[in-house]
Structures are given as structure tokens and as C-alpha cells.
């Protein structure tokens, strides 16, 4: 006896209701898509009368063939009376930046903190405007942070300039031009052995920072000790008129011609002045040198007398003074013409 296979169509349609046999077909079909003005008026009238509640009940009670979600979105995004229109204010933009840095892309939570704005509106405004502005600002900050390094790279080469302690920048090439004539004097300076002089008031106006005592003059430690166009620098008592440009017979001050003044270190020998000019005839005051010329017009080597070697003027602490008078007089007995007045 053969078994018949069951009909596949019968099994497939077994669980479905038979509409022809009086099945439940009374459920209305909901609408989708755009809202009509009539639907908007029904929803507004019901919401202003009854307020918010369950959106599925609102759709049914308002006589709308819409689902609850569609009614909620239509009311919140378009129909509520407190809805703001137009562009965002600068205060709202700052608040969106702040809330987005905390909440991220949680637009519904951000919208609850901006009255009158919807989450969809805030999201669209962020993606279209604020996100690009934030990216541009970050790029500008990155470029501005790298610009100081570029400006520092354009600064002058330290081999071409040096800066003294006073903040003045001078060129090394100018110093090299004065290398050979650094110790020259405008005219010959001669000292009369019969004229006494005082060491104390030797320097009255040198343009230095401080003058502690008559026997010591401290010069700022800036490598090259330059004092510019200085006239009537040294005041020497008892010296007569020894030249038109060396000694002033009225004020008894030593004035030299030239642009730059340099003071070498002189701790063992009394040296009056040095300047840049054409002729050089520098004489020491110590009689043990017998008024010997220390330099000539082209090159010189002063050695221990001035603390200079091969025309180099890079000195640490140049001074005029700090003599031990007792030891100096004991070692040099031939000082009858020098009258040192010490207070």
C-alpha cells in the first residue's frame, strides 16, 4: 500500500487566516510620507488642547492615520510653538562646541540643552558648518605654532655679530677693520718729566657704569669695550698744551680724534688714552721704560705692559688702577716728579 505525500501548498497556507472565510480585515492602513496641511492642523489642535502623552494614543485620538513616531517627529521638528527658526547665534554655537566636546554625537541630549532647537537641526548644522570651522582652527593653530621656529631660523648668524652686556649689537667685521689701528693716537702724546700730575682725577667722564675710587675704573665686561665718540675723556692736572687734539689748555682734559675708544687692561703701567687714528706713538708714564715708544704705525706688541698680545682686544676685566703704591715706590726709586695724591 503506497503512502501519499502531503500537499506542500496545504501545509504552507495552514497557519494563514482565510480571508474568504471571514478573517479580521478591519485594521486601517497607516499613511507614510509627507504630511498634509489638514493633518498638521489636526495634530496642532489636539496638542494645544490635551498636551503631550503617548504618541500612539495621540495619533489615534487626533484622527490621524499616522503612527506615533511620525506624529512625534512632526510635532517636535516642525509644529511646536516654541520652535526657533533661522541661523544659530554665536552663544548657541559656543554651547554646541562645549556640549559636543562632552557628549559627542548625542544630538538628542544636546538638543534638550538648547531650547527651541531640534536634534536633527543641530546635527545638520554641525556637519555642514561647525565641524569644518573646528578643523580650520586646528590647522591654523598648528601653522602658527611652527612659525616662531621659522622666524628664529632667519635670525642673524652669531659669527657675523656679537652682543655686549649692554644690549648693543656690533659687527665683528667692523672690529676687524680697526685691528691694525686700534691703539693709535691722533697726535704724539708727550709727557713732561718736570710736570707733576695726579692719578686720582685722571678720568672724569668716560661714560662708564661706575667709578668706585680714584685709582680704579671698571669697564663693563663685554668683550670689546667701546665708548663711541667721546671728547674730553681724561682730565690730567699739570699737563700743558701738548697738541691741538690731545690736550685742551682750558679744561686740561685729553680729547682725542677718532670714532671709537678702547681701554686696554693696565694693571702694571699707567697708560693715559688709546684711540683709532692714523699715527701711533703711545708712551708709558713709568720712568723705568724711559719714555719708550710702545707701538708703531703698522704693528705693535705691547706684551705685559698693556696685557695685549698680537693686537687681540678680547679681555676679561680691563681696569685702570689697583696699583700697590708702596711696592711701586720701593721697586722704582726714580719717582721725584710724580705726585700721587691719595685720599
UniProtKB/Swiss-Prot annotation:
Residues 27-79, 80-134 form the HTH myb-type domain. GO terms for biological process: positive regulation of DNA-templated transcription; regulation of secondary cell wall biogenesis. Transcription factor that acts as a molecular switch in the NAC012/SND1-mediated transcriptional network regulating secondary wall biosynthesis. Is directly activated by NAC012/SND1 and its close homologs, including NAC043/NST1, NAC066/NST2, NAC101/VND6 and NAC030/VND7. Is required for functional expression of a number of secondary wall-associated transcription factors and secondary wall biosynthetic genes involved in cellulose, xylan and lignin synthesis. Functions redundantly with MYB46 in the transcriptional regulatory cascade leading to secondary wall formation in fibers and vessels. Pfam families: Myb_DNA-binding. Keywords: Activator, DNA-binding, Nucleus, Repeat, Transcription, Transcription regulation. Disruption phenotype: No visible phenotype under normal growth conditions, but the double mutant plants myb48 and myb83 nearly lack secondary wall thickening, stop growing after developing one to two pairs of small leaves and subsequently die. Residues 1-16 have a biased composition (Basic and acidic residues). One of its GO terms (molecular function) is DNA-binding transcription factor activity. GO terms for cellular component: nucleus. This is Transcription factor MYB83. Gene3D superfamilies: Homeodomain-like (1.10.10.60). It is found in: Nucleus. Residues 55-79, 107-130 bind DNA. Residues 1-33, 134-172 are annotated as: Disordered. Expressed specifically in fiber and vessel cells that are undergoing secondary wall thickening in floral stems. Expressed in vessels but not in xylary fibers in the developing secondary xylem of roots. Residues 136-155 have a biased composition (Low complexity). InterPro entries: Homeodomain-like_sf, Myb_dom, Plant_SW-associated_TFs, SANT/Myb.
Amino acid at each position: 500500500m503506497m503512502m501519499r505525500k502531503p500537499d506542500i501548498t496545504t501545509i504552507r497556507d495552514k497557519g494563514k487566516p482565510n480571508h474568504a472565510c471571514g478573517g479580521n480585515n478591519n485594521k486601517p492602513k497607516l499613511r507614510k510620507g509627507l504630511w498634509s496641511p489638514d493633518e498638521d492642523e489636526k495634530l496642532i489642535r489636539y496638542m494645544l488642547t490635551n498636551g503631550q502623552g503617548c504618541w500612539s494614543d495621540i495619533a489615534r485620538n487626533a484622527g490621524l492615520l499616522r503612527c506615533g513616531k511620525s506624529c512625534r517627529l512632526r510635532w517636535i521638528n516642525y509644529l511646536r510653538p516654541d520652535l526657533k527658526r533661522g541661523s544659530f547665534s554665536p552663544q548657541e554655537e559656543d554651547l554646541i562646541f562645549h556640549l559636543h566636546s562632552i557628549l559627542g554625537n548625542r544630538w538628542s541630549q544636546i538638543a534638550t540643552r538648547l531650547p527651541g532647537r531640534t536634534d536633527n537641526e543641530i546635527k545638520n548644522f554641525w556637519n555642514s558648518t561647525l565641524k569644518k570651522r573646528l578643523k580650520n582652527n586646528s590647522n591654523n593653530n598648528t601653522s602658527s605654532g611652527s612659525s616662531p621656529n621659522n622666524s628664529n631660523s632667519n635670525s642673524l648668524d652669531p659669527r657675523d655679530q656679537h652682543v655686549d652686556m649692554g644690549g648693543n649689537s656690533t659687527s665683528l667685521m667692523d672690529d676687524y677693520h680697526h685691528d691694525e689701528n686700534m691703539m693709535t693716537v691722533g697726535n704724539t702724546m708727550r709727557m713732561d718729566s718736570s710736570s707733576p700730575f695726579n692719578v686720582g682725577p685722571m678720568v672724569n667722564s668716560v661714560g662708564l657704569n661706575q667709578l668706585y675710587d680714584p685709582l680704579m675704573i671698571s669697564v663693563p665686561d663685554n668683550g670689546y669695550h667701546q665708548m663711541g665718540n667721546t671728547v674730553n675723556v681724561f682730565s690730567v692736572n699739570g699737563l700743558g698744551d701738548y697738541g691741538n687734539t690731545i690736550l685742551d689748555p682750558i679744561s686740561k682734559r685729553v680729547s682725542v680724534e677718532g670714532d671709537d675708544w678702547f681701554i686696554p687692561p693696565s694693571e702694571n703701567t699707567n697708560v693715559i688714552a688709546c684711540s683709532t687714528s692714523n699715527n701711533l706713538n703711545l708712551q708709558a708714564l713709568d720712568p723705568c721704560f724711559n719714555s719708550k715708544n710702545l707701538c708703531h704705525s703698522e704693528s705693535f706688541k705691547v706684551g705685559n705692559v698693556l696685557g695685549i698680545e698680537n693686537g687681540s682686544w678680547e679681555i676679561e676685566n680691563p681696569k685702570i688702577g689697583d696699583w700697590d703704591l708702596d711696592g711701586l715706590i720701593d721697586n722704582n726709586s726714580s719717582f721725584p716728579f710724580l705726585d700721587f695724591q691719595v685720599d
